[in-house]
């Protein structure tokens, strides 16, 4: 038997004893040595970790692989490297593998309802390997209880806003609407403060452009941001349009975009899954 095979079976045997504290004899080239396997120190069993996290940093999770966390007193040296300013040491962290506008609308509502501030918004290239983004958002506040409340509220609202995300094998569509844009939507999409806000993203990108064109022709609205794979995104396969204006006009634009977007996406061969309940 090869040495590598011997070591493989030896390690398997050691692993079975790793939580027993028993002694075993390990063969050497010149005889044997006797060693005691330290109980619990040799191999970690990740299934010993509960799925119900009790860490103080943990706030919760929700749909779209979203997690909410807090840090009550961020390390000073790390804070200086984060490029978010040094005003706040109590931070809220909100991060998802899939989706952007739904979570950002939830964060926007949460910040408006609490004594917290948006410090940074990033849209990583993710969507678990699909065509779009995930999100990584940092909040700050003077009181960790305010920050925790904002993150908890955003987690709850994400379940609502996930209702306008449509994901199929062929692509995805995302829509959002807010009657009054706040600081998160202003920072991410240059929304007009206090005005109605609308958002649409389509993947493949060609569907997104047709949706954007349909929205602009449907009602009198103002473009606040326009993004493509090479412009404003992390090279996602999307065209993204956000709008501001009168509430009824913005909603009409988004609804018209949704209708044509769904027809085009379904024409590619499969019906989309919806991780929530449509709310528009």
Predicted feature residues:
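A structural signal for small-residue-enriched, beta-sheet-centric alpha/beta enzyme cores
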Residues: 46-99, 122-134, 142-143, 162-280
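Amphipathic alpha-helical interface surfaces
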Residues: 103-106, 150, 207-211
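Active-site cofactor/substrate anionic-group-binding motifs, chiefly glycine-
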Residues: 100-131, 141-146, 157
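Short, conserved beta-strand segments within well-ordered enzyme catalytic domains
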Residues: 138
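Short amphipathic alpha-helices in soluble, non-transmembrane regions
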Residues: 149-157, 253-259
């Amino acid at each position: 038997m090869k040495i590598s095979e011997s070591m493989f079976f030896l390690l398997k045997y050691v692993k079975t004893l790793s939580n027993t504290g028993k002694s075993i004899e390990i063969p050497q080239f010149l005889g044997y040595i006797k060693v005691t396997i330290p109980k619990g120190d040799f191999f970690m069993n990740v299934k010993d970790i509960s799925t119900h996290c009790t860490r103080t940093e943990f706030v919760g999770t929700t749909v779209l692989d979203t997690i909410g966390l807090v840090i009550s007193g961020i390390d000073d040296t790390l804070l200086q490297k984060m490029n978010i300013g040094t005003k706040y040491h109590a931070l809220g962290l909100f991060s998802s593998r899939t989706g952007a506008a739904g979570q950002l609308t939830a964060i926007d509502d949460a910040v408006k309802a609490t004594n917290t501030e948006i410090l940074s918004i990033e849209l990583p290239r993710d969507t678990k390997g699909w065509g779009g983004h995930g999100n990584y958002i940092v909040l700050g506040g003077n009181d960790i209880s305010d920050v925790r409340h904002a993150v908890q509220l955003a987690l709850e609202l994400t379940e609502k806003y996930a209702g306008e995300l449509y994901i199929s094998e062929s692509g995805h569509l995302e829509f959002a609407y807010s009657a009054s844009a706040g600081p998160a939507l202003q920072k991410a999409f240059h929304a007009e403060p206090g005005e109605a806000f609308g958002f649409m993203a389509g993947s493949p990108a060609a569907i997104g452009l047709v949706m954007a064109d349909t929205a602009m022709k449907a009602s009198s609205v103002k473009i606040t941001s326009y993004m493509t794979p090479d412009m404003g995104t992390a090279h996602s396969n999307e065209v993204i349009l956000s709008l501001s204006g009168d509430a009824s006009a913005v909603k009409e634009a988004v609804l018209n975009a949704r209708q044509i977007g769904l027809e085009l996406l379904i024409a590619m061969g499969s019906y989309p899954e919806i991780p929530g309940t449509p709310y528009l």
